Amino acid sequence: MFDYSIFAKEIDELKNQGLYTYIRTLESPQGAWLVIDGKKVLNLCSNNYLGFANEERLKNAAKQAVEKWGVGPGAVRTIAGTFSLHNELEETLAKFKKVEATIFLQSGFVANQAVIPAITNEEDAILSDELNHASIIDGVRLSKAKRFVWKHRDIKDLEEKLKEAKDARRKLIITDGVFSMDGDLAPLPEIVELAEKYNAMVMVDDAHGEGVLGSHGRGIVDHFGLHGRVDIEIGTLSKAFGVLGGYIAGKKELIDYLKQKARPFLFSSPLSPADTAAALEATKILQESDERVKRLWDNAKYFKEEMKKLGFDTGESETPITPVMLYDAKLSTQFSKELFEEGIFAQSIGYPTVPKGKARIRVMISAVHTKEDLDFALEKFEKVGKKLGVI
């Protein structure tokens, strides 16, 4: 019989290093406040940027979809699993993103695994930022293309890598739009200029830019005014949109090709009618108003400014993501536990999610937080920070 003690030993080692992830169980819907282990806590670590995860309009849309379409698609989309509701979501997303077409997948993670190996082979070169998301890294691993990893946000290094890849049939530059652990932005205008100079494609994963950046939350491409110059946009429906799923946006020819070649599209069932309808409703709300997006930024600006006044190191974030840098993994884990005891739910992030020696509490501000919520958080961060000698 297999000896499972090897896994137990590895788990013990993770605990000793302060790298073991303790998974909390929610006993309430997503929102500014949660109930965990019977305790009411302020939620500072979800990706529910705009509060859509428990929004009445989305819930009603999901209920109506279940009544009309049932609970599941019943097949993959290429056989008998494409409802007109699915097509409506893709068409609405395309209009919202100002692209020709979109295709949605089961998650943003899956979207990266779908597109990268589908459009590259051993004759091609992929150039990837060193801090790109795990889903991009795994997508690149599924491709047979030659790989070049360029230094984080370093345009000069990217150009050197493009020169090294000059003999490739096709060159694909991939970057996160917003880097999820630090909150910094990709230098997308400079990347696009290099891509045009070296005849390369540009792909941006905008998981943390959707609903956050640009007019009405259209994302980083809109933020920089680069419509028509970025070949592939990857989006998620599980963060600011508050639901589930991911999508690929771009030229109609690309999307048609992916419907024939992308393995997750071909061999796995699509989103349920409820998820599809809720995501569609979220898109409609964003099209109607950017009030929530503005409120999100106002909240984030206030919280960051006050945290800096208290003496916390909040990194170089350019977005509502606020990393509270503690560096030591054990300290970060203890800080998170102390915050929870004070009524704050803010998880510690350590290796391998971030490099060793870069542990932090990643604070995620949302549009549904009130000033009173944020002041409560600031009070508790100050208390724990002083207790643990951080400030």
Swiss-Prot record:
Its pathway? Cofactor biosynthesis; biotin biosynthesis
- Residue numbers binding substrate: 133, 353
Enzyme Commission number(s): 2.3.1.47
Q: Name one GO biological process term.
A: biotin biosynthetic process
Q: Which residues carry this modification: N6-(pyridoxal phosphate)lysine?
A: 239
Q: Is Cytoplasm included in the keywords of this UniProt record?
A: no
The alphabetized UniProt keywords are:
Acyltransferase, Biotin biosynthesis, Pyridoxal phosphate, Transferase
Q: Which cofactor does it need?
A: pyridoxal 5'-phosphate
Tell me, how does this one assemble?
A: Homodimer.
- State its role: Catalyzes the decarboxylative condensation of pimeloyl-[acyl-carrier protein] and L-alanine to produce 8-amino-7-oxononanoate (AON), [acyl-carrier protein], and carbon dioxide.
NCBIfam families recorded = bioF, gly_Cac_T_rel, PRK06939.1
By what name is this protein known? 8-amino-7-oxononanoate synthase
UniProt organism field:
Thermosipho melanesiensis (strain DSM 12029 / CIP 104789 / BI429)
